[in-house]
């Protein structure tokens, strides 16, 4: 016997003991966020406790609604739990990394197919969390996929792609095969799985592994100029990427190595300054750091040395979506906001908000920039606007604004001010005029230069995070926070002399979660 918790629809009911058939079968039917689970409840009563126990069950009332927990991010993706015995956050030991449901880390298998953005992520150390979206904003989490097995062990990080040419032979007349590539953690070998029902069910390839070379994190994509697949994995040799090539996804040839890279490889092509005749390849590693150059189908040739992408303390395991339609044309990235704290919550860790990547010339160098996807506008509930106003010490323009979810955009001339900043959830995001840098909580100093005398900043503020983008994404910083309960409303402040605000927009945001207790 053990304490269990039960969801009635989306309502969490707690406070009685029972035995549970916990794990859903692999072919279980899915609804938006519900799963059918059979429960066998046995109530033990002893002595004078009979009446109290029965009364407690009769009077069981909803506690915390799923997705409305106090520290649940409201527009950043987090995982839910599927094992019924772990739905109660009060059970000690369930909410630390090492096998609990509700955990996620590296985003994996980001792929677009037939109108759906698929998001996978490492979950509970042994499978992939799975969610789909029509708009990159609202997510429906489906039951976990690619569970561990005795042969391969836990399912570690990887990638996904659509097999448009059916080189695998897994496709059908009606459906192209979705392919997932992952590390089988038992021997740290590279494996493949496929789906022919739009990612709802997956079959692991019978002759796994497809690449016996250790270590991990296979990134696989189709290289059109030579009609072959490219796989990039992390090490060995230590702190290196290894490139492989294949025509049929079964026989792989080692092509080359690339040094000074660590974990979670990703590689994609972008036009420089929007010029399709000047495309570059970008090779990025675990923390988003990247090199820019050319790829000839065998080797990556560096044209510019490694640069940092994000200056925050909670940004890791970056991945971009594969198979984005040509008519869309965007390169879209997510990352794990590693290290966030969510005490007493039935989930752990969150992902960044999806961002578009672009390659721009900044101060005579090529710079990878990231900026929130335009679909965030679907969440705007109310907008407050100011134009051409003077901001001075003691004059807080935001004094009448309430809430905890915001998309804030400001363009300003520092003028005579020493600093201009926002205090949100008790944390500062500040531009310092003399030093010409932006700091957000623990963020490394983000050195920025004015454009036509102006600084542009954008802040995405969720319950447990602040993402900062400066000069339309030339510099960014992702940080997790712990908000103060019943903390002060957001505030704009200026130190020293006046600053001139050319434009300020504060958009209050709606939750992305169904029935999350918000309008």
Where are these regions (language model features)?
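Conserved Ser/Thr-centered positions that define the repeating blades of beta-propeller domains
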Residues: 133, 193-196, 243-246, 294
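Entry beta-strands of beta-propeller and related beta-repeat scaffolds
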Residues: 116-119, 168-180, 227-231, 276-281, ...
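Bacterial N-terminal signal peptides
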Residues: 7-15
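Carboxylate/His-rich catalytic cores and anion/metal-binding grooves
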Residues: 157, 175-204
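Structural motif
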Residues: 127-129, 188-191, 239-242, 289-293
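Short, low-complexity, charged amphipathic interaction modules
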Residues: 27-51
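Surface loop/turn signatures of beta-propeller and other carbohydrate-active proteins
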Residues: 53-109, 121, 137-172, 199-222, ...
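Beta-rich accessory regions
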Residues: 61, 70, 74, 296-316, ...
């Amino acid at each position: 016997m053990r304490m269990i918790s039960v969801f009635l629809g989306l309502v969490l009911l707690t406070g009685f003991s029972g035995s549970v058939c916990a794990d859903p079968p692999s072919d279980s039917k899915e609804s938006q966020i519900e799963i059918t689970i059979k429960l066998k409840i046995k109530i033990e009563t002893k002595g004078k406790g009979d009446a109290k126990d029965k009364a407690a069950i009769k009077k069981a009332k909803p506690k915390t609604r799923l997705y409305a927990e106090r520290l649940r991010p409201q527009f950043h993706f987090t995982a839910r739990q599927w094992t019924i015995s772990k739905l109660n956050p009060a059970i000690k030991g369930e909410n630390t990394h090492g096998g609990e449901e509700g955990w996620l880390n590296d985003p994996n298998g980001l792929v677009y197919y037939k109108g759906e953005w698929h998001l996978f992520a490492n979950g509970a150390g042994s499978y992939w969390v799975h969610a789909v979206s029509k708009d990159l904003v609202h997510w429906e989490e489906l039951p976990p996929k690619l569970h561990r097995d005795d042969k391969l062990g836990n399912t570690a990080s990887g990638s996904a792609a659509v097999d448009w040419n059916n080189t695998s032979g897994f496709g059908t007349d009606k459906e192209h095969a979705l392919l997932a590539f992952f590390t089988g953690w038992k021997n740290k070998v590279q494996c493949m799985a496929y789906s022919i029902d739009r990612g709802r069910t997956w079959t692991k390839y019978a002759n796994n592994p497809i690449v016996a070379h250790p270590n991990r994190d296979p990134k696989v994509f189709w290289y059109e100029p030579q009609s072959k697949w490219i796989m990039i994995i992390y090490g060995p040799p230590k702190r290196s990427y290894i490139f492989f090539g294949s025509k049929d996804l079964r026989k792989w040839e080692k092509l080359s190595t690339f040094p000074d890279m660590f974990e979670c490889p990703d590689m994609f092509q972008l036009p420089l300054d929007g010029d399709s005749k000047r495309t570059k390849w970008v090779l990025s590693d675990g923390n988003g750091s990247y090199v820019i150059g050319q790829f000839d189908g065998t080797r990556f040739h560096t044209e510019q040395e490694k640069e940092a992408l994000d200056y925050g303390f909670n940004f890791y395991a970056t991945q971009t979506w594969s198979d984005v339609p040509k008519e869309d044309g965007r390169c879209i990235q997510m990352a794990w906001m590693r290290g966030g704290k969510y005490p007493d919550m039935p989930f752990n860790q969150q992902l960044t908000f999806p961002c578009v990547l672009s390659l721009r010339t900044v101060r005579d160098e090529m710079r990878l920039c990231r900026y929130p996807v335009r679909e965030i506008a679907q969440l705007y509930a109310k907008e407050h606007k100011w134009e051409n106003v003077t901001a001075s010490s003691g004059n807080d323009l935001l004094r009448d604004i309430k809430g905890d979810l915001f998309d804030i955009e400001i363009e300003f001339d520092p003028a005579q001010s020493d600093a201009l900043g926002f205090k949100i959830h008790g944390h500062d995001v500040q531009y310092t005029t003399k030093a010409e840098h932006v700091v957000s909580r623990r963020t490394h100093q983000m050195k920025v230069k004015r454009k036509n005398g102006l600084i542009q900043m954008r802040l995405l503020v969720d319950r447990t995070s602040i993402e900062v983008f400066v000069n339309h994404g030339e510099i960014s910083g992702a940080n997790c926070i712990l908000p103060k309960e019943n903390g002060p409303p957001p505030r704009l402040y200026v130190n020293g002399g006046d600053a001139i605000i050319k434009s300020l927009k504060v958009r209050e945001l709606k939750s992305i979660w169904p029935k999350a207790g918000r309008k």
